[in-house]
């Protein structure tokens, strides 16, 4: 077992990040911290099997969307969303710490590969990220009435949800597992503002 773990550690040290610069990493960490704090999600807290299942289902969903993408807008959206999910897993465990963690290196390696993939298509990854982050922040409900209306909207689609207050906001989330949505996933407010990657990629709508 010690030999196996030693080989794994050596392998992690040999991973080279080509596209994920420190500047990008720290910017991603700050944005994800804002998201997770606003929505009452864990930051540097115990990472449970439930958390692991949720994060895994989210990245699986995004990679499926990437595989099904038929245009640059959908492809860029799936790539950035995938990095957003992976950074969520990372910040859950590391916060905005600049200390290096070999155990979490595979996450950063996956992030790096996704950014390189984005670059290969000529996308401005950071501009796409900023647009999607702003959109993700709009998922929060600004009043309890908005949260209740959002819950009713999901109920009309037979999606069981609930909401909780976090600071000055209310967050709607999936209540219980379903075939394609895990319990605890943050859901969009009815006043959610979709990302506009058409504008980012082409400068037009």
Segments from the language model and where they lie:
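Flexible "arm" and connector segments at domain edges
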Residues: 2-205
């Amino acid at each position: 077992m010690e030999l196996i773990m030693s080989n794994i550690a050596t392998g992690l040290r040999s991973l080279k990040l080509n596209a994920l610069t420190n500047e990008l990493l720290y910017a991603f960490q700050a944005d994800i911290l804002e998201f997770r704090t606003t929505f009452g999600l864990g930051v540097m807290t115990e990472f449970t099997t439930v958390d692991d299942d949720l994060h895994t289902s989210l990245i699986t969903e995004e990679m499926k969307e990437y595989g099904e993408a038929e245009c640059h807008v959908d492809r860029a959206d799936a790539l950035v969303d995938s990095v957003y999910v992976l950074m969520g897993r990372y910040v859950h465990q590391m916060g905005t710490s600049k200390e290096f963690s070999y155990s979490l290196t595979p996450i950063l390696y996956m992030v790096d590969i996704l950014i390189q993939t984005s670059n290969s298509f000529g996308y401005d990854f950071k501009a796409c990220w900023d647009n999607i982050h702003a959109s993700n922040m709009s998922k929060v409900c600004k009043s309890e009435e908005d949260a209740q209306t959002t819950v009713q909207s999901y109920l009309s689609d037979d999606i069981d949800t609930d909401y909780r207050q976090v600071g000055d906001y209310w967050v709607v989330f999936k209540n219980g597992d379903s075939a394609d949505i895990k319990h605890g996933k943050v859901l969009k407010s009815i006043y959610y503002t979709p990302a506009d990657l058409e504008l980012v990629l082409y400068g037009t709508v």
